[in-house]
């Protein structure tokens, strides 16, 4: 099975290539914090030899509570992303929530992301696809992995085949998510790169009444399980003070644990991809 290669600058993204990290923080809390977080990611990924793309959101449009922090907004967020790109010479990924945002975001960001909850919204999908940008498609918590073919088809029909699929867990009763490891293989059959969003797979949606809970202590176990499937990349959020983060702190890795965490996953990815394929069908 031929695996498609998506290129972002000098980074090659494919299921049979060394894994790429989409990493950063959940939401832009401030310019200074974003710079601090990106600086540490750059230091660690350069040391470990992991291709890196900075990730953050300028707006969290689906917060549980109307009083929850959402972010600085698109205009201010794009200014921060531009500064990060200039300062650290790294690509940037962020999410798009409405069709009108697609074009201006794609002019600044190297990858635009289709949020899981919005992944079946055809107008949004088409608007994003028509930019020609690389798109990271989050699999909705309510979709089976094989249903991702319909979202891929919408993008392809709009003329865009620069696509990445991303697993972030499936609803399992109330306030819980699970990750079906068999789903990775199903999505890899579409030949597009597949990523694992380990951070949001650890969510307990609505678990704290007015916000999501999480299981940070299990991030290493779940990340190893996912990356053992031979994936194109990992999606990760970290924070210097997760307990006081403005969004999804319970799921975020502590920033000072980033290096030992990624070092283990790098070794695992190298090992898994050194194995020959065994055809068992």
Swiss-Prot record:
It is found in: Cytoplasm. Pathway: Carbohydrate biosynthesis; 3-deoxy-D-manno-octulosonate biosynthesis; 3-deoxy-D-manno-octulosonate from D-ribulose 5-phosphate: step 2/3; Bacterial outer membrane biogenesis; lipopolysaccharide biosynthesis. The keyword Cytoplasm applies. It catalyses: D-arabinose 5-phosphate + phosphoenolpyruvate + H2O = 3-deoxy-alpha-D-manno-2-octulosonate-8-phosphate + phosphate. GO terms for molecular function: 3-deoxy-8-phosphooctulonate synthase activity. Its EC number is 2.5.1.55. One of its GO terms (cellular component) is cytoplasm. The keyword S-adenosyl-L-methionine does not apply. Keywords: Cytoplasm, Lipopolysaccharide biosynthesis, Transferase. Its main location: cytoplasm. Gene3D superfamilies: Aldolase class I. GO terms for biological process: keto-3-deoxy-D-manno-octulosonic acid biosynthetic process. Transmembrane segments: none annotated. Belongs to the KdsA family. This is 2-dehydro-3-deoxyphosphooctonate aldolase. It comes from Pseudomonas putida (strain GB-1).
